[in-house]
């Protein structure tokens, strides 16, 4: 039962409920009008009777998310980078704005306000939950629609669990998600790919880019290759290489949270006190495990590279630190993805004549080119790129380039229209203005005498 009590100018609703431990708890709620108090009393009694009463909780968004995140991580066996990414979303894009709000007081409009605020927020405004001082240039680069969509996706999942856990009756996350930002990545055509590769003198960068272009690899997959992945006699002597692992640098704290089930190797730290560590891990998805066919030119480069590794080790064998990776520095240490990226950026700075792209753009360039030369054989290209589904591949590379679309339009024109045929209607010839005799006589009746005289003269001549 619930009871209404008048206190001064307000009305209170007092009731008793049982908490999670079965303990009786008294609760008092205050309202400004008697009508509000009566409605709340009816609601409480109805919910207590049918078991839908929501136990009052003061847990905040921050407290809930920081409890939910590790549980999700353990349940779904997240990789360290996945945990790191989701933790960053919570710490930098959610907690600073709604972290102190109580879960049970959160409404859909609060989240709509959050999305609106984020759309006007510069990238990197918060790092590890701490507000950063940004330069004027940095303040001009705002969070993308895709990032805000990821915030929405995480909150939608988290708040569904809040309902399951009895913290909320209904999720306050809006039904409509923020729109993703769809931006076409800059890519290279075949001529640019070949010319760029030919101009790269750094042997590590040259091989990394060559492998990426042939196999449409991710940078972590390139860095994760080992000599054992190469099979020069595979595919009847064509030569193949396997993609079954990737290299990443991860936060040690994230690694401690997620465990090491997906970790194949942890590399020695270069610096003492580092908060990150370089790891070799299983690939992103099962479909990422694949075999790539070598080209004859790549095959020769790989053979020369393996000889180079032997020569490097022979120079100072006692100081050589063999990481076991295919891409190594002269001292044997692994070449990690960020170093490949830095080498590529440096090369681009020195060669402004090429379209500026990110290193991952090489994967897009390769996949796009392979789709074009295969005549759109999505399944064959998917086998090379390692996309999780054919739909994902099609959606990612729907643009295919303007050149191929122009050619498609030309082929349509040649195949659809009959030779010499035209569908353009001729414009009607504009006839000279005419007037009937009766209409002319009517005009003459009211005409000026001088006009009548001119008309008579014109008719006679």
Would you name each region that the model predicts?
Residues 242, 250-273, 280-304, 321-344:
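C-terminal catalytic core of Y-nucleophile DNA break-rejoin enzymes
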Residues 123-127, 198, 202-205, 215, ...:
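Short, basic (Lys/Arg/His-rich) helix/loop patches that form interaction surfaces
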Residues 3, 17, 70-161, 333-339, ...:
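N-terminal core-binding DNA-recognition domain of tyrosine site-specific recombinases/integrases
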Residues 179-180, 187, 245-249, 385-411, ...:
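Catalytic-site neighborhood detector that most strongly recognizes the C-terminal catalytic loop/helix
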Residues 124-129, 133-145, 149-151, 164-227, ...:
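Basic, Lys/Arg- and aromatic-enriched nucleic-acid-binding interface segment
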Residues 229-237, 375-398:
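Short, polar N-cap/turn motifs at the start of nucleic acid-interacting alpha helices
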Residues 7-113, 307-322, 417, 421-435:
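N-terminal DNA-binding module of tyrosine recombinases/phage integrases
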Residues 232-235, 245-289, 410-461:
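C-terminal secondary-structure termini that scaffold catalytic or DNA-interacting sites
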């Amino acid at each position: 039962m619930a009871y209404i009590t008048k206190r001064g100018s307000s009305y209170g609703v007092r009731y008793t409920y049982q908490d999670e431990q079965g303990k009786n708890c008294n609760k008092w709620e205050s309202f400004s009008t008697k009508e509000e108090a009566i409605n709340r009393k009816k609601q409480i009694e109805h919910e207590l009777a049918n078991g839908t009463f929501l136990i009052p909780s003061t847990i905040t968004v921050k407290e809930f998310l920081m409890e939910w995140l590790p549980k999700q991580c353990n349940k779904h066996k997240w990789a360290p980078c996945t945990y790191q990414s989701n933790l960053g979303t919570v710490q930098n894009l959610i907690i600073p704005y709604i972290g102190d709000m109580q879960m049970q007081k959160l409404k859909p409009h609060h989240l709509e306000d959050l999305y609106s605020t984020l759309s006007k927020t510069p990238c990197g405004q918060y790092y590890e939950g701490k507000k950063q001082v940004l330069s004027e240039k940095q303040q001009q680069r705002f969070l993308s629609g895709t990032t805000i969509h990821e915030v929405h996706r995480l909150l939608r999942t988290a708040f569904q669990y809040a309902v399951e856990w009895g913290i909320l009756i209904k999720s306050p996350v809006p039904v409509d998600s923020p729109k993703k930002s769809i931006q076409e990545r800059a890519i290279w055509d075949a001529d640019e790919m070949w010319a760029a590769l030919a101009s790269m003198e750094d042997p590590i960068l040259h091989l990394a880019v060559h492998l990426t272009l042939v196999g449409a690899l991710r940078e972590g997959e390139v860095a994760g290759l080992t000599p054992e992945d190469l099979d020069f006699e595979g595919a009847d002597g064509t030569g193949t290489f396997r993609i079954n692992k990737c290299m990443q640098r991860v936060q040690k704290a994230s690694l401690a949270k997620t465990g090491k089930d997906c970790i194949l190797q942890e590399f020695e730290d270069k610096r003492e006190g580092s908060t990150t560590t370089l790891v070799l891990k299983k690939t992103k998805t099962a479909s990422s495990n694949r075999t790539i066919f070598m080209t004859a030119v790549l095959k020769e480069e790989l053979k020369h590279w393996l000889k180079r590794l032997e020569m490097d080790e022979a120079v100072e064998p006692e100081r050589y630190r063999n990481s076991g990776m295919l891409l190594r520095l002269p001292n044997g240490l692994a070449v990690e993805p960020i170093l490949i990226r830095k080498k590529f950026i440096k090369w681009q700075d020195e060669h402004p004549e090429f379209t500026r792209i990110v290193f991952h753009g090489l994967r897009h360039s390769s996949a796009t080119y392979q789709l074009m030369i295969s005549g759109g054989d999505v399944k064959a290209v998917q086998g090379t790129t390692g996309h999780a589904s054919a739909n994902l591949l099609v959606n990612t590379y729907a643009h295919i380039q303007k050149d191929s679309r122009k050619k498609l339009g030309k082929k349509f024109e040649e195949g659809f229209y009959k030779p010499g045929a035209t569908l353009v209607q001729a414009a009607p010839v504009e006839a000279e203005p005419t007037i009937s005799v009766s209409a002319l006589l009517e005009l003459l009746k009211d005409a000026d005498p001088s006009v009548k005289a001119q008309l008579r003269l014109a008719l006679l001549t």
